[in-house]
Amino acid sequence: MVNLKIAFAICFKSLQAAYQVSCRNLRFPIEHGQRSCPSQEFFMSFTFEKCFTSDGVEIEGLYQIQPKVFGDARGYFLETYSEKDFFEAGLKMKFVQDNQSKSSKGVLRGLHFQTLHPQGKLVRSLQGKVYDVAVDLRKGSKTFGKYFGVVLDSEKQNQFYIPEGFAHGFLVLTEEATFAYKCTDFYHPEDEGGLMWNDPAIGIDWNSVAGDVEPLLSEKDKKHAAFDSNNNYFDINGKWTN
């Protein structure tokens, strides 16, 4: 009986070791920013989803990102960033500065960009909900002057990646929201640029998400210029051209 138990234990350990080796080696290729295997969530802590205009045209470089959240009776755990997973998805940016802001309902921050020091941003809501928007300002892009918006929700833990060459802004939908940014370049106040939050040429439909909320803007954000389709803004790689 003792020998049988020993044999069973050895067999179980061997099977367990073999399974662990197979799991380590079973790495699936990235296709269109996502793993091609339906079991991807076991191996990767994030899913990456491309973004499209309302008429179905892909806005290259924008990604909605959903971390895998592990929850139980104690609470939850998640990875908010992994260089390994992001690099495998083709997002090989380097972040150099983290920012955080807190705003009340109806606050609209934007639409912002930096000129000579453009910033890529990985953004998420730590508390509350915001409607987050990116406008493509890359001259030569097939979506130049187009926008994409997504609701970022602290309960969902979803994220949004915006590369260099975009204007960015958000509107707070809940009583309060705490917002976090990871940036690929440092803040340079001398390089601040912006667009009108309600520019008719861009046509961001804030009301579809926020209803009749009257946005609260800073004096600076009230004075941003209108979008000019003849302005080069950034090149296709997100570098300032003016």
Regions found by a protein language model. Name each.
Residues 42-158, 174-176, 183-242:
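Non-catalytic, conserved peripheral segments adjacent to functional cores
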Residues 35, 39-43:
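Short, Lys/Arg-enriched N-terminal segments with co-localized hydrophobic residues
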Residues 28-29, 38:
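Intrinsically disordered, low-complexity segments enriched in serine/threonine/proline/glycine
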